[in-house]
A protein has these predicted regions:
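Absolute protein N-terminus
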Residues: 1-2, 147
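Small/aliphatic-rich secondary-structure junction motif
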Residues: 3-55, 79-88
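Histidine-centered beta-alpha loop that forms part of the nucleotide-sugar donor binding/catalytic region
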Residues: 10, 94, 117-120
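Short, well-ordered secondary-structure micro-motifs
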Residues: 18, 45-48, 99-102, 125-126
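Gly/Ser-rich helix-loop-strand patches that form or flank binding pockets
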Residues: 24, 106-147
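Structural motif
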Residues: 36, 90-92, 146
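A short acidic, glycine-rich active-site loop
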Residues: 55-71
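Structural beta-alpha unit
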Residues: 75-113
Length: 147
């Protein structure tokens, strides 16, 4: 059925359910799993009143974000290994979440994308919801959205 399944995670509870579902699907299909999280770049403000940080401070913050992202995909790997599913882990640094998901699926030759319908609350939910919509409308491979 599927050979390689990409699952996008942001660490939210619904996202964790999507990971579990993707792992089960990979196990049933004897497919490889690609666990992906997208980490934003530190925003640089060019507007008056914006707080400028030293490049070393920005690098430190981004490194922390990458560590957090790595922890998320490491958890995917741990869960997949328990089920005997081979997983490849990807932490992508991008401000364009949907594009990063689509690009990772293409790069790793995935034939299915699994993601949660939402995970965050408030403004982040609104923004990430639009990311999900972008993946749904721009992906050339099937997308499974879990609620």
């Amino acid at each position: 059925m599927f050979k390689r399944i990409l699952v996008a995670t942001d660490g939210s509870s619904l996202s964790k359910k999507a990971v579990g579902y993707a792992i089960s699907l990979a196990e049933q299909s004897d497919a490889e799993l690609v666990g992906l999280t997208v980490v934003a770049r530190y925003p640089t403000s060019y507007f008056e009143g914006g707080i400028a940080l030293a490049p070393s401070e920005v690098a430190r913050i981004e490194a922390q974000w990458m560590e957090s992202g790595q922890s998320l995909v490491d958890a995917v790997n741990t869960q997949a290994a328990r089920k005997g599913v081979k997983a490849k882990l990807v932490v992508s640094k991008s401000d364009l979440i949907a594009e990063a998901i689509i690009a990772a699926a293409k790069k790793h030759k995935c034939d299915l994308i699994v993601m949660a319908s939402h995970g965050r609350k408030g403004l982040k939910r609104l923004l990430l919801g639009s990311e999900k919509q972008h993946v749904l409308t721009h992906s050339t491979i099937p997308v499974l959205v879990l609620r």
